[in-house]
Amino acid sequence: MSGNQPQPSVAIAGGGLAGLAAACALADSGFRVTVFERRPYLGGRASSYEHPGTGEVVDNCQHVLFRVCTNLIEFYRRIGVEDQIRWYEDMTFIEPGGRSTVMRASALPAPLHTAPSFLRFPFLSMKDKVAISRAIGALTLFPPSDVRHDAGKSFLQWCCEHHQTQTAIDRFWKPILVSALSEDLDRISISSAAQVVRESMKSPAARHMGVPAIPLTELYNRAGDYIRARGGEIRLRTSLESFCSKPFCAQPSQVKVHLTDKEDKTAKEESFDYLILALPFNTLVRVLPQTSESESLRQHLTHFESCPITGIHLWFDREISGLDHAVLLDRTVQWMFHKSRLLITRSGRGQQEESGERTAGANVARDENSAERKLREGHDFSRAVEVNLKNGASAPHASYIELVVSASKNLIDKSRADIVDLALKEVREFFPAAREAVLLKSAVIKEVHATYSPRPGLEAHRLPQTTPWTRVFLAGDWTATGWPATMEGAVRSGYLAAEALTRAAGKKDSHFLSPDLSATGLMRLFS
C-alpha cells in the first residue's frame, strides 16, 4: 500500500490467539487494526487472572505446545516472548504407587527415535507394545483411506478393529489423545487421532514440549503491545453484538459493527473496511445477521459441540515432587504441572528457587465473569471457579501444582469439595511425599467450552476463512485449519484469515503461515 493512501481499517472481534495472530500479521502489513475483546484481558481461553480468594495469579487451564507448532512458535517470536517458554525433551509417566518411567529420544532416526524408551515401558506388556507399534505404522507410514479422511468412524472403533489391547488403549492411546484432543476416544475421529500421531513421529524434535513460564495473560499482553506499537488499538470490555455488510459485491460498502461497551453499558456503531470474526463457534452463531446469507453458516455451526477441561490448583506446605511435569496413568487426573518450579519470578528463577515468593503478574486483570463478581451478585458459581482456603499464603519451599483433566464431562456437575478430595486422593497415590503434606489452599476452574469435540464427520463442517460477505472473514481453532483445537490451530486460523483479507485488499503475495516442521530420518520417505 502506498504511503499516499490511508491505511485500510480492520475490526477484529475476539482477543484470543486467533484474533491476536491475525491482528499482528495485519498490523505488520500496513492495516489499521482494532481488536475488540469482551473480557478485561487478552488471551481468550488461554488466559490468567488474580483468583479471588486465593490471591494467586492462576491460568484458567494449563496450556502447552510442541515443536511441531511452527506457527505458534513464530507468533511467540514475532511478539517477543519466545524466551518465556521452557522446553522439555523428556516426558515422565507415573503409575499409581509412584513408579515412574521416562520417555526420551535416542539416536535412532524418526520414527524409531523413541523406540528404545517405549520398549522399556514397564506398564505395557510385549503384546501391548506389538499392537501399538502396528497401529502407529498404520496411522503414520501407510495410512489407509479411513485414516487419511474422516470416515465417520471413531478412533476407539478403529482401535478395536486393529486389535489394540485394553491396556494399550488405557495406558497409551488415552493419555496421548485425550490430552491432545480433549475428547474421549469413542468421540474422536480417526483422522484427528492420526494427525496427532503423525506430527509427533515426524522428527525427534517434534515431541519436545514447551510450557509458558509466565502467566498466560502476561504472555499475550505482549501481543497487545505489539499491535499498539504499529498503530493499532485494543479495546477491552467491548463486545461485538452484530454486523452489517453487503454480500457477494465486488465493491461493497464498509462493514458496520454494532458494539457494546461493558464498562459504561453503552451501545455504539462503527464502520471499518474489513471485519474478522475471531470468535468461538457458540458465540459466532449469535452475532450472524438474520439473513439468508447466514443460513449455510448456521447449519454448519449446529454440528459443533464443546468439550470441557478442568484445572485443579493445589498449594501444599512442602515440595511433593522434584518433577516439573508428569503424565499420570489409570486415574481421573491426567497431567501434573509443578507450577512453583515452572513459573519464572521477576529475578528469572523458578518460584521454588525464590523461597516461595508469589509470581508477579503485572498486567493480569480480573475476569469480569470471575467468581468474585458472581459472589457479589449472589450467584452460584460452582460451574465456573471454586475456591477452598485452608490456610494463609504459601509457605517457603512449598509446592503449587496444577492438575489437568481433559474431556472432564464427569466433573462438571461435581462440587468443589468432591473434586478437591478426588485430586488429593490421586496425588497421594502418585507422589508419596504428598501424603504428609498439608493442603494450604485450592482452586477448581472448569472451562466448560474449552475446545470443540473432534467427532467423526465434523471435518466437513469446519468453515473456511472466507464468508458470503466479501469484507468479512472467520478465524478460530474450529475453522478449517488442517489442525485440531489447539493453540497452533488458533494461530493458523488467524494467519489464514489475514492472508484471505490481504488478498481481498489487493495484496496477492501476502503469506503469513510458517512451513510445517520438516520430517527427518525415515519419516522423510513417508511425508
Regions found by a protein language model. Give the residues of each.
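Conserved flavin/dinucleotide-binding core of flavoenzymes
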Residues: 336-346, 396-527
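Helical element adjacent to the flavin cofactor pocket in flavoenzyme catalytic cores
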Residues: 196-244, 252-261, 274
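Mobile amphipathic helical/loop "lid" adjacent to a hydrophobic cofactor/ligand pocket
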Residues: 72-73, 77-78, 82-193, 201-206
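Extreme N-terminal leader/targeting segments of oxidoreductases
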Residues: 1-10, 28-29, 520-527
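Glycine-rich FAD pyrophosphate-binding loop
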Residues: 27-52
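Glycine-rich active-site loop/strand segments that organize a redox cofactor
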Residues: 44-67, 139-143
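Mid-domain catalytic core of redox enzymes
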Residues: 238-246, 253-346, 365, 384-385, ...
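N-terminal Rossmann-like FAD-binding beta1-loop-alpha1 element of flavoenzymes
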Residues: 8-35
